[in-house]
Amino acid sequence: MARREKNPIRATVAMNIGLSDSLLAFVNNYVKALRFSLFWMKENVKNPNEKGALSKVHEGLYEKLRKEYNLPSKVTEDCYRDALAIYKSWYNNPKKGRFPRVYKPTVWLTPKQSYTVDLEKMTVRIASVGELPILGYPRNLKEYANWKMKEARLTIKDGKALLKVTFEKEEEKVKPKDSVAVDINMNDIVVGKDDTHYVRIPTRLHDAHHFKSLAENLQKKYPRRWKQNRRILHRARSFHQKAKLIMEDYARKVGKWVVEIAEGLGANVIKLEDLKNLIKDVNKLPAEFRDKLYLMQYRRIQYWIEWQAKKHGMIVEFVNPSYSSVSCPKCGHKMVEIAYRYFHCPSCGYENDRDVIAIMNLNGRGSLTLSTAPQMRDVAPNR
């Protein structure tokens, strides 16, 4: 049997499907069966982590769920597996808290046996419900036509039926060719491979920080009332949410743009900074800078760059960013700042912007052997 890929690429796609009486009845029966299964496990399965717990649950619940709740064979298995996962999550939580209740109308579905999606006819077939049309879907749905379908979640909300399908594919094994480096900072993101081939992407940090400041000013204006007054609380929350959504949307778009730039420069390796110690001393920073650092979501941006790169068959490598903005990319000596974010090397005379210096240094680091990568110079850097 082939060994399973450790880190497959996954994407979740939400589709709006047709709502019918049979679908509503199916979801209602599933939720009732899920509630019953949870309380049955509380009484009969003292330790869900012990060996044979799933077999015990199957013996105790399978026939009962099928007959009393009129669930198809595979959906019955999905139901008690779903309940067991919820029960385990509660059981393994040290604080425990209240025993979980099921209110939201959601159904766990297994591909092929519980549901199938036909992307050509734009239909979904669900066991015991039948064929339903796909009414709405994202524009990039066709990109996942060759991906493997995994488990899905069917949700009823605000009179609409949403099917959230997880697609999965294995990472492509590619041979490294050329590479680009990405330098992320608060003003812009620079992508390139040298001081002539690079692109600057402005950030939206200023917009996000503006809405966060509006929320904080509102809280300062009403220091006691903002928690009790529903209108003030709602407005403050909306400002915070808007700031968060701006940066989340920006991070997703940057992932696509970086991959497009890399393809345009003929590279299939993207080098990112290893940010392990990014906020190690964050409490020592000024308050405004600290706020912007949290808002910027460096790791979120890197996550979407890495995800898009793997989706398009590229390699991502994390390299040490130490002194990448102040070391001369030509001779390795420490550079001197002669203007705002502009550095000069006293040894060889090279001058450039610190962001361009950073991508040149980052692109020369890493363990990958690239056919067109510049050779490392035998110079001891002045660190």
Swiss-Prot record:
Pfam families linked: Cas12f1-like_TNB
UniProt keyword annotations, A-Z: DNA recombination, DNA-binding, Metal-binding, Transposition, Zinc
InterPro entries, sorted: Cas12f1-like_TNB, RNA-guided_DNA_endo/Transpos
TM segment ranges: none
Keyword Ubl conjugation tagged: no
Single GO term (MF): metal ion binding
GO annotation terms (biological process): DNA recombination; transposition
Binding-site positions, Zn(2+): C328, C331, C345, C348
Family per similarity comment: In the N-terminal section; belongs to the transposase 2 family. In the C-terminal section; belongs to the transposase 35 family.
Name listed for the protein in its UniProt record: TnpB-like protein ORF383B
Native species: Acidianus two-tailed virus
